[in-house]
């Protein structure tokens, strides 16, 4: 009986102990030498829970944090120690017990970290976001995850696999601080994502190019295993699609990868309406009205790449990628019926064609040193082999058989470039210092045959040095950087060089508890493109010539922004006011010329104008009607622009907005949005993109397989529309491109991902260099 009582007592104690111990997060903390770290301060902060669970690691580095009453919550685990950098870990839907893998801390403190149980952690140049477990489960790719987490002002074009900051332009995607291709983002497994960094204030380390924003996805790739998958997005209403296939294999320190992607379109209904009004030398108006006739459109892109990655955690990382890009556009012309002053009705055929091949090799190496110091090397070689042609023909009849006049030219272009980059980073107390140097060497040779038979040979080089420091004083976060560049360009016997500076200052301060205010000032240099610098002159039609200008000089753009943001459990609001000013910008200029016989023609080119200024205000609001289930968002902007040229002044006003909603119900995802017509002005030209109504529904059949439907330009008779208008004192133009086959376009999306293998915490960080210049002069 005593033995039975003893057995029952021991069993009860064991059960009680098990129940007590199960409500906790446990783990072991070590340093880079794998030695245990004692006296580390561990906190667990959960959404909707004001109190924090607190613990301290023992001499063996072991800690345990009580999670009683926190089951099912989304939390952030923070580890602090005076001798090490802070460590953050997102924990979603906490079960009763979690036993974490060994956690390794890096030496030295980079910056004091404020951990909040909110969607965002604000930094001086970025917002940190930890995707919830629901976000991860609902997502099929990197693009899908970016869309699900609702970054402020960010729009994800799921059909074309593009990310934009609404009203500001495209947003490049980085994975572990290395620029990612579309295929890389498609192949990204959402369950490998540690956090998303929304860099809405890119610093000088991103080079001379000024990005509206940058998104960096921090992932923990697989150490052993494989992944294979595809993402197919093809229209069922017309010939249009974008498809990706990829495979990766990991073994110990190595990873091999291969991918293929294509996008294509083949349409039979596309037309361009255009009205041109010329003020001739004698003061008379001459009008040419072009009525569009449906014409075929066809193009195809093909990308293929292989990747090898050799990484030894904490010591080095070597990545090499070889890729090729093929583009072919055999049918890109348009037919028109012409009504011209003083002439009978006639017809015209405009035919631009383009084919190019571009191989790229990208070598990346990163070395890790003690005290959290890193040194990065990147070398990218690019080649473009381009065949471009432009032809404009007129005809007496609708058969388009015997041309009565024709203008045009053909181009055989070659472009070679090599970009090298070195970047060094190390902590300085509670600040972080980053410096680097980048050099580009390029050679371009374009042979033109047509109106003028010429050969353009251009050499260009660019050397860019930068240094940046970021940190904080009490609650004030700061980032101060400066970049300097030496640019060289030569063409024929002429050569030019100039120096560019890019200083940048950012100040950020928390207000009203969960609010933040940020001021940004920067000077961004702008260099002329190789195409505009070309010493070239080509005739487009009877009245128009397009000319290059090798005398163009760089100019600087001064920008100031003030951003206020506030986050609440049920909403997020952000307002940005900005002002931008440019002295002697490169803008369009149209010159009228005439002969004694009364013949008038117009040169379209670029010149240094007097000034350009933009003032804008943009407000973005997100309502979490049912958190993690139903979200409503919208944005509204106002833009005022003023361009002062050598012989013109233009004032431009624009109002723009959008509304959208996202709904998540179990395995179902729904998304719908409306965006207004977008208008932009530059120099003497206005560009418009028509309104868009889109909707998407997805169903997750299994964890690895999902199917969906995507509709774009819904309920719009003319489908996708694009417009251009010229407001010169000599030439008035109004052009609209109609693509009705893209109206009510329904696409079927099928995504499959299969992966096997365990994971590890990634340490890859890097840079991105790519040359997209061809220097080719393109007709309109």
Model-based region annotation:
Residues 254-255, 301-327, 350-494, 500-503, ...:
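Face-selective signature of the C-terminal outer-membrane beta-barrel domain
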Residues 176-205, 245:
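Short acidic/polar hinge/loop motifs at secondary-structure boundaries
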Residues 143-178:
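Extracytoplasmic beta-strand/coil segments of soluble accessory domains associated
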Residues 208-215, 223-273, 298-301:
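Outer-membrane beta-barrel translocator/receptor signature
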Residues 48-62:
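Short, acidic Ser/Thr/Gly-rich low-complexity loop/linker segments typical of extracellular
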Residues 99-104, 112, 116, 142-145, ...:
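N-terminal periplasmic accessory domains that precede
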């Amino acid at each position: 009986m005593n033995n039975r009582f003893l057995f029952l007592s021991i069993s009860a104690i064991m059960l009680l102990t098990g129940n007590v111990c199960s409500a906790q997060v446990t783990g072991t903390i070590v340093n880079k030498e794998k030695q245990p770290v004692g006296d580390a301060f561990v906190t667990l902060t959960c959404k909707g829970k004001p109190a924090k669970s607190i613990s301290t690691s023992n001499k063996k580095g072991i800690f345990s944090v009580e999670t009683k009453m926190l089951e099912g919550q989304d939390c952030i685990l923070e580890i602090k120690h005076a001798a090490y950098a802070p460590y953050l870990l997102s924990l979603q839907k906490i079960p009763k017990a979690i036993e974490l893998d060994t956690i390794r801390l890096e030496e030295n403190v980079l910056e004091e970290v404020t951990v909040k149980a909110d969607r965002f952690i604000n930094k001086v140049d970025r917002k940190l976001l930890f995707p919830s477990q629901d976000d991860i489960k609902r997502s099929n790719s990197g693009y899908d995850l970016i869309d699900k987490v609702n970054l402020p002002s960010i729009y994800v074009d799921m059909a074309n696999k593009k990310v934009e900051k609404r009203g500001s332009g495209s947003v490049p995607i980085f994975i572990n601080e290395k620029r990612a291709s579309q295929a890389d983002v498609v192949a990204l497994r959402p369950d490998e994502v540690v956090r998303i960094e929304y860099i809405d204030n890119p610093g000088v380390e991103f080079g001379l190019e000024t990005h509206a924003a940058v998104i960096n996805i921090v992932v923990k790739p697989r150490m052993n295993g494989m992944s294979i998958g595809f993402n197919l997005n093809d229209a069922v209403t017309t010939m249009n699609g974008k498809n990706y296939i990829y495979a990766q294999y990991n073994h110990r320190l190595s990873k091999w990868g291969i991918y293929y992607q294509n996008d294509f379109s083949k349409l039979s209904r596309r037309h361009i309406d255009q009205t041109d009004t010329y003020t001739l030398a004698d003061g008379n108006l001459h009008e040419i009205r072009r009525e569009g006739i449906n014409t075929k459109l066809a193009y195809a892109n093909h990308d293929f790449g292989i990747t090898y990655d050799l990484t030894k955690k904490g010591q080095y990382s070597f990545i090499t990628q070889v890729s090729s890009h093929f583009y072919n556009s055999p049918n890109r012309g348009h037919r028109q019926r012409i009504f011209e002053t003083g002439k009978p009705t006639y017809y015209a055929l405009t035919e631009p064609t383009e084919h190019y091949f571009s191989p790229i090799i990208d070598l990346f190496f990163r070395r890790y040193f003690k005290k959290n110091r890193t040194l990065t090397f990147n070398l990218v070689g690019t080649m473009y082999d381009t065949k471009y042609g432009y032809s404009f023909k007129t005809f007496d009849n609708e058969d388009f058989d015997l041309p009565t006049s024709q203008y045009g030219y053909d181009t055989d272009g070659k472009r070679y470039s090599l970009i090298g980059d070195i970047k060094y980073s190390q902590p300085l107390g509670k600040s972080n210092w980053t410096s680097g140097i980048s050099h580009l060497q390029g050679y371009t040779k374009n042979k033109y045959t047509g109106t003028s038979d010429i050969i353009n040979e251009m050499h260009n080089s660019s050397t860019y040095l930068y240094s940046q420091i970021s940190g904080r004083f009490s609650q004030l976060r700061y980032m101060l950087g400066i970049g300097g560049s030496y640019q060289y360009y030569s063409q024929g016997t002429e050569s030019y060089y100039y120096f560019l500076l890019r200083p940048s200052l950012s100040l950020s301060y928390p207000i009203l508890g969960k609010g933040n205010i940020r001021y940004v000032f920067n000077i961004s240099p702008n260099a002329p493109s190789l195409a505009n610098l070309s010493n070239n002159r080509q005739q487009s039609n009877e009245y128009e010539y397009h000319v290059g200008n090798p005398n163009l000089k760089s100019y600087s753009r001064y920008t100031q922004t003030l951003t206020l943001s506030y986050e609440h459990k049920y909403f997020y609001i952000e307002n940005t006011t900005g002002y931008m000013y440019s002295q002697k910008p490169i803008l369009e200029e149209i010159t009228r010329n005439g002969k004694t016989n009364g013949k008038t023609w117009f040169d379209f080119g670029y010149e240094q104008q007097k000034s350009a200024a933009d003032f804008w205000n943009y407000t973005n609001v997100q309502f979490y009607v049912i958190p993690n289930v139903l979200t409503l968002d919208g944005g509204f902007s106002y833009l005022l622009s003023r361009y002062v040229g050598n012989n013109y002044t233009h004032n431009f006003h624009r109002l723009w907005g959008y509304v959208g909603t996202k709904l998540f119900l179990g395995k179902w995802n729904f998304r719908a949005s409306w965006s207004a017509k977008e208008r932009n002005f530059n120099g003497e030209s206005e560009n418009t993109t028509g309104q868009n109504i889109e909707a998407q529904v997805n169903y997750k059949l299994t964890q690895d397989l999902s199917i969906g439907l995507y509709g774009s330009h819904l309920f719009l008779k003319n489908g996708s529309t694009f417009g251009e208008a010229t407001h010169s004192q000599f030439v008035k133009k109004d052009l609209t491109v109609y693509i009705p086959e893209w109206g009510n376009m329904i696409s079927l999306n099928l995504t499959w991902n299969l992966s096997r293998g365990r994971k590890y915490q990634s340490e890859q960080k890097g840079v991105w260099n790519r040359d997209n210049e061809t220097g080719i002069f393109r007709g309109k």
